[in-house]
Amino acid sequence: MPKVDLYNMKGEVVGDIQLSDNVFGTDVNKDALHAVVVNQLANRRQGTQSTKTKSEVRGGGKKPWRQKGTGRARQGSIRSAQWVKGGIVLGPKPRSYRYTLPKKVKRIAMKSALTSKVSGNEIFVLDALALDAIKTKSMVGVLNNLKVDSSALLVIDSKNENIVKSARNIPGIKTAYVNTLNVFDILKYDKFIITKDAVEKVEEVYA
């Protein structure tokens, strides 16, 4: 079982914590990670792109010249695709890019992402995280104590307005709950900061 240091809010090591092999010590499956990240990005797409077809562009209702006898190529409308200001053939229309992946693939990817943070020494486990008030300076102090000078994902076990609002104005810092944790965010942010209580919930869900 992987063992990592347990920190307090002052950045001091106050012990260690054993992490579940089934969640934080699995093999990293890059194929599953790729599949889930692509899926998440596809599901975020609005799909509102739209082009006008020949029947939708303005004008072009009259045949520009008679069919035969002019010496020119036959034309039915000045809004056919080959004309300037003509309609688009087979252009994009509003659509949904959303698709689902098997739950098993998602679980494998989540475990792989968490394992990659442990194996890369990019995880900080806090014994507790509590702020008396909404104060960005206090959260910056915690991050400085942990010597986190890059982007970080902060995971807490339950809703806490003081923590969320204290962290939201810090560039490169994002707060997540256990039930909103996702593979893309874990991989996107350099450091993974999680409370001890959140670790227990993650292991309960994914073990």
UniProtKB/Swiss-Prot annotation:
Keywords: Ribonucleoprotein, Ribosomal protein, RNA-binding, rRNA-binding
One GO cellular component, as annotated: ribosome
Stretches of the chain forming a coiled coil according to its record: none
Biased composition (Basic residues): 60-71
Disulphide bridges: none
Gene Ontology process terms (BP): translation
Annotated spans, Disordered: 44-76
SUPFAM superfamilies xrefs: Ribosomal protein L4
Gene3D superfamilies: 3.40.1370.10
Cross-referenced InterPro entries: Ribosomal_uL4 (IPR002136), Ribosomal_uL4-like (IPR013005), Ribosomal_uL4_dom_sf (IPR023574)
GO molecular function: rRNA binding; structural constituent of ribosome
Keyword RNA-binding part of the UniProt annotation: yes
Signal peptide range in chain numbering: none
Similarity remark: Belongs to the universal ribosomal protein uL4 family.
UniProt xrefs under NCBIfam families: rplD_bact
PANTHER family xrefs: 50S RIBOSOMAL PROTEIN L4, LARGE RIBOSOMAL SUBUNIT PROTEIN UL4M
Function comment: One of the primary rRNA binding proteins, this protein initially binds near the 5'-end of the 23S rRNA. It is important during the early stages of 50S assembly. It makes multiple contacts with different domains of the 23S rRNA in the assembled 50S subunit and ribosome.
Binding partners and assembly: Part of the 50S ribosomal subunit.
HAMAP family: Ribosomal_uL4_B
Protein name in the entry: Large ribosomal subunit protein uL4
Organism lineage: Bacteria, Bacillati, Bacillota, Clostridia, Eubacteriales
Gene name as annotated: rplD
